């Protein structure tokens, strides 16, 4: 529907709590590569506005962080950026101090 009604519009989706296999939980490590690649293609290559408005270089930049944990940045101008965070990695059951944890990697990325 988005492609039909907004073919020339940049659409920047983010994950909600019911957008993964197990509601309110991030993607399990064993499913991560397949899931994020599938969603990346839907959101950034198949939505016509995104495919038209984002350069290949920008899509590659988005894909690097998106594949790591479903988060990304889009620079609209040299002074305005959109940060799309995947907050499913932040709950009371996850240890944020585990090296390689997607939530910690996202925070490290955000600090840069």
Where in this protein do the model-derived segments appear?
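Short acidic, glycine-rich surface-loop motifs adjacent to enzyme active sites
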Residues: 112
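Extended active-site neighborhood of metal-dependent phosphoesterases/phosphodiesterases
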Residues: 2-109
